[in-house]
Amino acid sequence: MKISLNWIKEYVKIPVSDEELISLIGSRLVEVEGVIDETHKYDDIYIVQVEKVEKIPETHLSLCQIDVGGAELVQVVCGAPNVREGMLAVWIKPGATVPVSVHEDAPFVLGTRKMLGKYESNGMLAGADELDFGGEHSGIAEIEPGTAKPGDLLADVFNLRDLVLEIENKSLTHRPDCFGIIGFSREVAGILGQKFNEPEFLYHEMVFPEGELVRGKDCIYSKNSDIQVQISDSSLCPRYSLALLKVNDVTDENKYLSKVQIMLAKAGMTTISRVVDVTNYLMLLTGQPLHAFDYDKFLEVGGSETAKVTVRLAKEGEKLELLDGEVVECIPSDILITSNDIPVALAGAMGGKNTEIDETTKNVLLESASFSLYNLRKTQMAHGIFSEAITRFTKGVSAGGTFNVLAEAVREINGKFLGLRDSFPGLGEPSVVMITVSEINSLLGTEYKKELIVKTLENVGFSIQVNGEELTVIAPYWRTDIHIKEDVIEEIGRLLGYDNIAPILPLHATAGEDKMFELKRKIREALARFGANEVLTYSFISERLLKKAGEDVGNSYKIVNSISPELQYIRQSLIPSLLEKTYMNEKMPVEKFAIFEMNEVYRKEYGLDKDGVPEGRIKLGFIVAERKNITETAFYKAKKYLEEMLKLLGIRVDYIPVKSAESDYKMFEARRSAKIMAGEKEIGIIGEFKNSVRNEFKLAPFLAGFEVDLDEVLENVNYKREISFGERKKEDLTITTTKNYAEVLAEVQAKYPEAEITPSTIYQAEGQETKNITFHIETKQ
């Protein structure tokens, strides 16, 4: 992409040298691959008036006397068919270089010479192509009367002493607004801290008489227009704007050398016709591509009396002849513009031959739209189309500016306005980011004042609401890349210059204690000391595994783009994964083992956070298994691990029996499981697994486990333990009772308040009402 510094200077006052400006652009905005120096390209080239024209017999040449602003006329031989007396033309004097050859290996320097052996010719009257302004060699360039006088330098009249930057497009992939001079200049203003002179048309739409416009659902249209627009999917085309104009001679080129022609040439484009030149010029200016249809052909293709425009995906096998004559076979991701469902354009890429503007065109349908960049990237690669328009669309042109650019095109073309339709089903709200001054300075390592931050952002179009140190940053419609705090912080750092940030280490305090990390470390050490092994399993599991464990599939989040059919759900418990690992371990020649895992789980009942992201809980899952054990129950085996671990954490717990109707504990056997309580708070579940679960996983009978909520455990830990300087007294206490375990434990704890009490066994003979409960008691002597 080529960017003219002179064009930038029309919108920004530049207080630095060109060299410094180019350096700033390169360091803060975009990679500059090269600079084309045109400061002397148009030296010794003047505006002149042709005073006398005489045809040279038997040739196509004319002998011309021209006024170059001096006392005497200068003679030039000219072969252009459009040379005539009284016209203002462009003269390249002897000794000057023809501009189109300036950058060639052998530039063409003019002199004074004899034509046909006797007619002296001093320099030449130049055509637009020879001036390097494009176009065909069909005559000499003509200057509009009143805009210059004989003797004026061409470079002064058209501001041609310029530096043209060659930009690396890839470094602007995320900035579609910078693919237009206005957006690029706005960024330059922000970098320099200067006011940006924004064109009024970006904010002021077409003016209509009162009641002329009608507002519908997601659309605006003029009363006198019968244009219909249907967009099949707003994600394919968030906005589609059309205007209908009657133009007397659409192919008429501007006979005078113009700023539009010169700017198109600087960007590497050629002049084609009045309408097309305006659309191309506005694309270079704003970054918004436009397209012009022959309206009468549009109706003829659709076989209707009114325009019925549909924006839709291509159907299998659809073909379309493009403006360049190539017939493309559409792919399913191509977006098509259709007239009564007949394709007339490959959206964002190129128009169709069947609606091409030509010398017969009387009515023009102008299009300004926003299309899905993802679809257009596929279109670009599939069909090998790399036009200026699709280059911009594939960067993500904002839907916010289509209508205003269309309105400016209507004004520039200056035809008879016949109607409009603006459809915007996918026009979203501006991005809003809440941030504080301290957050900005903390991440950048700076001490920027609030006022400087606000001014910097406002200079490039952001709206800022200030509440003390808090800033509400509202992104302008053209900044489709702003979503999070870091995006805003990056803008400030870039615009003010990363090179201006002092390389000083931040005076941050060391990271605070991570209590969860410390808790996990202690649990890991404790369980490993007791012979358990830590495992790490996938956070994603299958529906089959959920059902095998008896869990409610509806309470798990399903992953839309899962990496495998076996990994479609985010787990809501660690136990199913541990049961699966237990099966794998039981196949090995080991008599007994215990495994555990600490990780995050997600359940729909946990809800969403403020950003709409599922809330998670950190859990500890544990399973103990033995091939053969006749001396104790699996429940109490698991309970020993749990209580030894909790003892090291300084947590006392109670147990409440699980009722069979409680759905949260479907995988546990109700008669052999209990809820783990820390005071009034439930922190987990412990128990033996149901036969149905064991059978599903093909596991041995001696199997139990627990799962505790580490977030809840963290609130109850007490690492401070009294140091004992004496031996501890150990004894067993057996109580025969009809009461349940929880009631008996409460009575024992009341009798031995300072002791560490661990249940040992519970025995109840068949047919007996009483049971024997044995506790292991340790007290200080």
Predicted segment positions?
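Phosphate-backbone binding interfaces of nucleic-acid-interacting proteins
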Residues: 1-210, 218-221, 365, 384, ...
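Extended, well-folded interaction surfaces typified by the phenylalanyl-tRNA synthetase beta subunit core
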Residues: 433-593, 778-781
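Conserved mixed alpha/beta core segments that line enzyme active sites in large multi-domain catalysts
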Residues: 47-76, 261-262, 273, 279-354
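A carboxyl-terminal module marker
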Residues: 2, 23, 27, 459-462, ...
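Mobile "lid/hinge" segments at catalytic clefts and subdomain interfaces of large enzymes
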Residues: 121-129, 139-141, 159-163, 305, ...
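Beta-rich nucleic-acid/ligand-interaction surfaces
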Residues: 39-43, 203, 282, 510-515, ...
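Terminal amphipathic helices with adjacent charged low-complexity linkers/tails
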Residues: 192-208, 221-231, 416-440
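Glycine/proline-enriched, intrinsically flexible loops and inter-domain linkers
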Residues: 5, 55-57, 197-208, 218-318
